[in-house]
Amino acid sequence: MLSKTGLIGALVRRSFGTSQMLRETIKNHEPNNLERRMLVWTGKYKSQSEIPNFVSQDVMERCRNKMRIRLANIMIALTAVGCAIMVYSGKQAAKKGESVTKMNLEWHKQFNDSQQSEGSAPAAK
């Protein structure tokens, strides 16, 4: 039977030492073309020719996380640019006197006029 110190030492070695080391050293993932490009884009390797046939799961997970963060940041920037463009175009339309309310009233007026003209035409026959 293990003593308390022996048991604690074994647990500490197991939780801190071996599992992380094994995850980093066991290279069991074969990256596809997209993953190879991601490994280059994130800076893990300088070119696709340097990438080995097998890499560790930990390296691929870190690479995917970096790409996910980059993509989210790009989408945030594009959303902000799109909002700025919409604000600018709305202000330009307001300067011209265009508004959604005016457009709605004009559409309803045209619709009602067309309905009245269609309604009166069959009655005249």
From Swiss-Prot:
Chief location of this protein within or outside the cell: membrane
Gene Ontology terms: biological process: cellular response to hypoxia; positive regulation of apoptotic process; positive regulation of release of cytochrome c from mitochondria
Transmembrane segments: 69-88
Domain of life: Eukaryota
An example Gene Ontology CC term for this record: membrane
Compartments, record wording: Membrane
Glycosylation sites: N112
Membrane topology (UniProt): Single-pass membrane protein
Residue pairs linked by disulfide bridges in the UniProt entry: none
Pfam families given in the database record: DUF1075 (PF06388)
Keywords linked to the UniProt accession: Glycoprotein, Membrane, Transmembrane, Transmembrane helix
Family statement drawn from the similarity comment of this UniProt entry: Belongs to the UPF0389 family.
The protein's name: UPF0389 protein CG9231
Organism this protein belongs to: Drosophila melanogaster
